[in-house]
C-alpha cells in the first residue's frame, strides 16, 4: 500500500479479523487508526504532520500510476515492490523454499499436469484446481535464466475436485 508521503507498505495476512469495538471494525490497518483515536492522541510523522493509517474501505489502495511505475521499474531491471491484497482462501501465496527448489528440479514440458490446492473461505474444505502445461519458452528479457514465468498453463473449465 502506498501512503501520500510515497511510502510503500507490504503485508501478508492469512484471513480478515473483524471486531466491532467502539463501532470500529478492526480490519487491515483499522486497528492502527482506532488505537490513536481511542487514546485521544495522533501519531506524528518525522516532520510533525499527522500520520495517516490505511483502511480496507478503499482508501490507501494503489493508483494506476503507482502500478505502472512498478511495472516500468521491473522492466528496466530496477527494484520494485509487490503489493498483494490477500483474501481468505488464497492459500500458498508465500511458498516454502523447499517446494520452490523441488519444482525447479522438475523438467516442465507441454502436457505436464499441475494441481493447486485452495482452501474455501471458511477453511472447512480444500478445492483442487488442475491444469496442464500448455507450452514452455526461453525467456529473453531482463529475467533471462530465471525459472519463473518460463511456462504457461491452462486450467480446463471443469468442476474442481473438492475434498471435505
UniProtKB/Swiss-Prot annotation:
GO terms for cellular component: mitochondrion; nucleus. One of its GO terms (molecular function) is DNA binding. It comes from the Eukaryota. Keywords: Mitochondrion. A stretch of 270 kb of the mitochondrial genome is duplicated within the centromere of chromosome 2 resulting in the duplication of the gene. The expression of this duplicated gene (At2g07677) is not demonstrated. Its main location: mitochondrion. It is found in: Mitochondrion. InterPro entries: ARF_dom, ARF_plant. This is Uncharacterized mitochondrial protein AtMg00940. GO terms for biological process: regulation of DNA-templated transcription; response to hormone. Pfam families: ARF_AD.
Amino acid at each position: 500500500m502506498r501512503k501520500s508521503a510515497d511510502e510503500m507498505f507490504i503485508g501478508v495476512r492469512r484471513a480478515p479479523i473483524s471486531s466491532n469495538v467502539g463501532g470500529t471494525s478492526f480490519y487491515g490497518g483499522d486497528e492502527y487508526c482506532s488505537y490513536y483515536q481511542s487514546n485521544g492522541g495522533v501519531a506524528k510523522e518525522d516532520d510533525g504532520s499527522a500520520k495517516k493509517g490505511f483502511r480496507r474501505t478503499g482508501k490507501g489502495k494503489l493508483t494506476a500510476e503507482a502500478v505502472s511505475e512498478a511495472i516500468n521499474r521491473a522492466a528496466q531491471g530496477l527494484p520494485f515492490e509487490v503489493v498483494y491484497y490477500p483474501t481468505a482462501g488464497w492459500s500458498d501465496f508465500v511458498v516454502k523454499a523447499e517446494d520452490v527448489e523441488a519444482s525447479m528440479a522438475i523438467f516442465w514440458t507441454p502436457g505436464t499436469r499441475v494441481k493447486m490446492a485452495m482452501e474455501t473461505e471458511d477453511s472447512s474444505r480444500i478445492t483442487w484446481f488442475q491444469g496442464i502445461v500448455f507450452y514452455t519458452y526461453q525467456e529473453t528479457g531482463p529475467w533471462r535464466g530465471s525459472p519463473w514465468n518460463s511456462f504457461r498453463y491452462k486450467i480446463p473449465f471443469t468442476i474442481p475436485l473438492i475434498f471435505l
